[in-house]
Amino acid sequence: MLQPLVDPSTGEAFQDLDKFLENKRVALYFTAGWCPMCTSFEPSLIAFRQAAQDSGKPVEILYVSSDRNKDASLQRAASLGMMAIPFGNQTAELKQRYKVWAGSESFEFGFGRRSGVPALVVLDKYSQELAFVAAEAQGLKALKSWDLDDDLGIWGT
């Protein structure tokens, strides 16, 4: 489901996914660089990621873009220090699977979404949804719904 990721600093596919995600907690971050709510949420998300790392509970957040084009997507993911899901079909599949997309994408994906951007889908070690972080609706307090102590959320264990 997640392979390959794109290293936004090079634009190339990142192939060694299992090793990269080993012993980390993983979330899909549905976002867009043009979205004011997303850009205001991101400093807290980055601080959360760093605090998790510092506490010995590393987190990997994967960028799922609602940006206007591939270049904007790669640039934004790189600025956040995140690996990216390849722009296009893979991001579309994830948006449909988890029912999360930007309002401007409703004509493409429909109106039956559970959330817009920003939002995170926390995955368990089997790539199944473990938790939903509804940042669009709840803002910064939404990060409290991510239980970093749940062993199901640690990949490669």
PLM-predicted stretches and their roles:
Residues 28-29, 61-63, 84-86:
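Structural recognition of the beta-strand scaffold that forms the well-ordered cores
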Residues 23-25, 57-60, 81-82:
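Loop/turn elements at helix/coil->beta-strand transitions in domains of secreted/extracellular proteins
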Residues 30-47:
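Conserved redox-active cysteine motifs that mediate thiol-disulfide chemistry
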Residues 115-157:
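Thiol-/selenol-based redox modules, centered on thioredoxin-like
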Residues 66-117, 121-122, 126:
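Thioredoxin-like thiol-disulfide oxidoreductase module
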Residues 42-78, 94:
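Structural microenvironment flanking redox-active thiols in thiol-disulfide oxidoreductases
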Residues 2-26, 54:
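A short beta-strand-turn-helix
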Residues 32-35, 66-69, 125-128, 137:
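Conserved beta-strand elements of beta-rich interaction domains across eukaryotes
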